[in-house]
């Protein structure tokens, strides 16, 4: 196996604190050869990192987003095997047209990665507004529900194999009273509910649940003190490229026996432990 090691520096809350992260890439350039993949919310953050990884592994990718300038910049960086479509994830009426356009660009869709989502970071149950609640549930849950429904109708109607990958969150594994966590928890339930229904029809459905990752969505958390590291097993923010490696595996044929799984990418922070001591060391 060809293993390429990249060393990256992940910034923590304080500039003086740095951590070195080693990433290993296996079968570089071949594991997704010929795959046609759509990534929603693919212009930045985890979505962009996934698109970049997929292309480097041989796939052709369509990314979506609402800001055309961001999409153009992303495609310029991603290269010739990338394309973009302007699509608002909450535009339920435009879903079938969106999938039709993606099919025309790629010649078909093998995998759909439902990554687009928002968080308003209310911080407290009492701060949640009806407008904010609806906005997050519509974008994170309702849109993904009906996009996946249309995609399954499309694939099953043609007797085609394929896969779907949802990007949820480690917060979905915990009791949560905020709209973001509620919506991601519901997505986990959707993945588990659908997966067994379609596996024998040649379609796999899984999810990855990242911990707090170094993206635009977590800018607020990055202003926190080093106390954050006490709440995370990793003691740092995760990197989008780390999440992308896992996503690549789940879309590849190497994971053909994996279906209906919520794979937490948070170094184990979601795990429940006895006691209240947050020191994870021995």
Region spans (language model):
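Short C-terminal tail/terminal secondary-structure segment
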Residues: 4, 17-26, 259-282
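Rossmann-fold cofactor-recognition segment
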Residues: 78-93
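Substrate-binding pocket helix/loop in short-chain dehydrogenase/reductase
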Residues: 123-125, 129-137, 228
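Catalytic loop of short-chain dehydrogenase/reductase
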Residues: 163-200, 212
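Short, small/polar-rich loop/turn modules that mediate ligand/substrate recognition or access, typified
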Residues: 199, 204, 258-260
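C-terminal substrate-recognition "lid" of short-chain dehydrogenase/reductases
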Residues: 236-265, 270-271
């Amino acid at each position: 196996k060809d293993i390429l090691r990249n060393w990256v520096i992940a910034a923590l809350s304080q500039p003086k604190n740095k951590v070195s992260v080693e990433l290993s890439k296996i079968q570089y350039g071949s594991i997704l050869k010929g795959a046609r993949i759509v990534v929603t919310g693919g212009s930045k953050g985890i979505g962009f990192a996934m698109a970049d990884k997929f292309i480097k592994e041989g796939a052709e990718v369509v990314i979506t987003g609402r800001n055309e300038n961001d999409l153009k910049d992303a495609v310029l960086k991603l290269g010739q095997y990338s394309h973009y479509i302007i699509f608002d994830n909450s535009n339920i009426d435009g879903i079938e047209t969106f999938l039709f356009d993606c099919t025309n660009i790629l010649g078909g869709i093998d995998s759909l990665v439902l990554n687009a989502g928002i968080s308003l970071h209310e911080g407290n149950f009492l701060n949640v507004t009806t407008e904010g609640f609806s906005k997050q549930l519509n974008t994170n849950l309702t849109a993904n529900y009906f996009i996946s429904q249309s995609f399954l109708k499309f694939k099953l109607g043609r007797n085609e194999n394929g896969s779907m990958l949802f990007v949820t969150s480690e917060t979905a594994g915990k009791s949560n009273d905020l709209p973001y966590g509620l919506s991601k928890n519901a997505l986990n339930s959707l993945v588990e509910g659908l997966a067994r229904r379609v596996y024998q029809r040649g379609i796999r459905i899984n999810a990855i649940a990242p911990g707090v990752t170094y993206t635009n969505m977590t800018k607020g958390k990055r202003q926190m003190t080093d106390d954050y590291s006490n709440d995370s097993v990793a003691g740092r923010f995760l990197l989008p490229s780390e999440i992308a490696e896992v996503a690549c595996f789940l879309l590849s044929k190497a994971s053909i026996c994996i279906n209906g799984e919520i794979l937490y990418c948070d170094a184990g922070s979601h795990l429940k432990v006895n006691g209240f001591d947050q020191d994870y060391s021995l």
